[in-house]
């Protein structure tokens, strides 16, 4: 199958960029499964040796499906956009993945695939594919250190304040790796935005990853990054997190007090169980296989399912 994957961004991303990293993982997964892949993305994109790159200015990707069609190679089977399209290019089967939450008052774009069962349900759909990543990018470590980790944007909806408050109450060191620097003291250490090897090392060494989401997470990519590293998750029951974090690999609660009380439970969880769950459910190959099934449905029936 010849799949055209379209992104607004330059790939791979510099810094964190969760959706962009998922796109790269998908391209690599499709190529590894033997599919032909063409990438439409910003100039400077360098993703996979096995994929053809077509550089497109961002404004042309955003303008219209008619503009987009100009860049789709002859003979392509399907377009997979990672940004909203009001309609697909004429004569080209297409799907699109929604990486965020859609405004309720705005009509949902056609052929939309969501990131989790909860994400789909909240938008009146049942069509979803869980995100996946390449396990080779993460370091498995069975022996953990005595500090906790918060990884990602320091926005209130990500709940970093809960992790900070827990560190203050318990005295346990919390390392925060994120893109905006507030003022932290005491048992909280801020290390800035991290990626690549440095992020992998932090994830592998941490006692647990905090994911105390205060919003309905469409997915929550740091969660599976932690699991690949053998690191359990401490978080809330919001959005997709209950689909990812089972009792064998983490602790989910509704309040900060409950999370603090249950916090020591993460030390009893088996790092190998965390890694195995991620390898079963959340690799780039599993994600690619699940998308291919949807592509095949669209090509055969014109419908997502």
Kindly label every feature range from the protein language model.
Residues 267-305:
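A charged, aromatic-enriched C-terminal amphipathic alpha-helix characteristic of glycosyltransferases
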Residues 94-139:
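Donor nucleotide-sugar binding/catalytic pocket of nucleotide-sugar-dependent glycosyltransferases
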Residues 126-175:
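Conserved donor-binding/catalytic core segment of Leloir-type glycosyltransferases
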Residues 9-11, 28-62:
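N-terminal strand-loop element at the rim of the active site
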Residues 244-257, 263-268:
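Conserved acidic donor-binding segment of nucleotide-sugar-dependent glycosyltransferases
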Residues 180, 188-205, 213-216:
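Conserved active-site histidine-acidic residue motif and adjacent donor-binding/catalytic loop
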Residues 232-235:
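Short hydrophobic beta-strand element within catalytic cores of glycosyltransferases
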């Amino acid at each position: 199958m010849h799949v055209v994957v379209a992104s607004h961004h330059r790939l791979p991303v510099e810094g964190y960029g969760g959706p962009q990293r998922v796109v790269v993982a998908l391209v690599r997964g499709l190529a590894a499964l033997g599919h032909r892949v063409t990438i439409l993305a910003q100039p400077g994109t360098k993703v996979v040796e096995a994929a053809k790159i077509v550089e497109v200015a961002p404004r042309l990707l955003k303008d219209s499906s008619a503009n987009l069609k100009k860049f789709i190679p002859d003979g392509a089977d399907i377009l997979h956009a990672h940004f909203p399209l009001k309609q697909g290019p004429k004569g080209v089967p297409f799907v699109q993945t929604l990486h965020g939450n859609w405004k309720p008052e705005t009509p949902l774009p056609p052929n939309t695939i969501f990131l989790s069962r909860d994400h789909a349900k909240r938008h009146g759909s049942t069509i979803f594919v869980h995100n996946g990543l390449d396990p080779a990018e993460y370091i498995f470590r069975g022996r953990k250190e005595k500090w906790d980790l918060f990884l990602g944007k320091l926005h209130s909806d990500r709940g970093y304040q809960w992790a900070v408050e827990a560190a203050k109450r318990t005295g346990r060191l919390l390392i925060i790796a994120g893109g905006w620097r507030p003022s932290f003291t005491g048992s909280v250490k801020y290390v800035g935005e991290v990626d690549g090897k440095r992020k992998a090392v932090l994830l592998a060494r941490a006692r647990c990853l905090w994911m105390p989401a205060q919003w309905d997470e469409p997915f929550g990519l740091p969660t599976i990054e932690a699991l690949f590293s053998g690191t359990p998750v401490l978080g809330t029951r919001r959005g997709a997190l209950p689909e990812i974090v089972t009792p064998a690999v983490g602790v989910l609660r509704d309040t900060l007090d409950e999370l603090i009380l249950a916090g020591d439970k993460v030390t009893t969880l088996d790092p190998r169980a965390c890694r195995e769950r991620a390898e079963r459910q959340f690799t780039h190959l599993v994600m690619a296989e699940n998308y291919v099934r949807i592509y095949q449905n669209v090509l055969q029936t014109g419908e997502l399912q």
